[in-house]
Amino acid sequence: MNGARESNAALLAALVGGVADCACDVAVCPPFPYLGQVADLLAGSKVTLGAQTLSEHAAGAFTGEVAGAMLAEFGC
């Protein structure tokens, strides 16, 4: 578990600037609590938003996993 709102912003600003002219695909898969922040920081960039711990189940009590429908709301 790594990340904090302030360090996420600094890291993503450097990443987005660093890949602006790169002929490659880049994705960032932050922990679930930071998806909203990271989605906002990546908006309009060529960096794709991904996610961690996608559950194979559509719903239910699966601690630590995230439902696909929940991730879709963030554009993952």
Predicted features along the sequence, with ranges:
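Non-catalytic positions within long, well-ordered alpha-helices that form the structural scaffold/packing
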Residues: G64, A72-G75
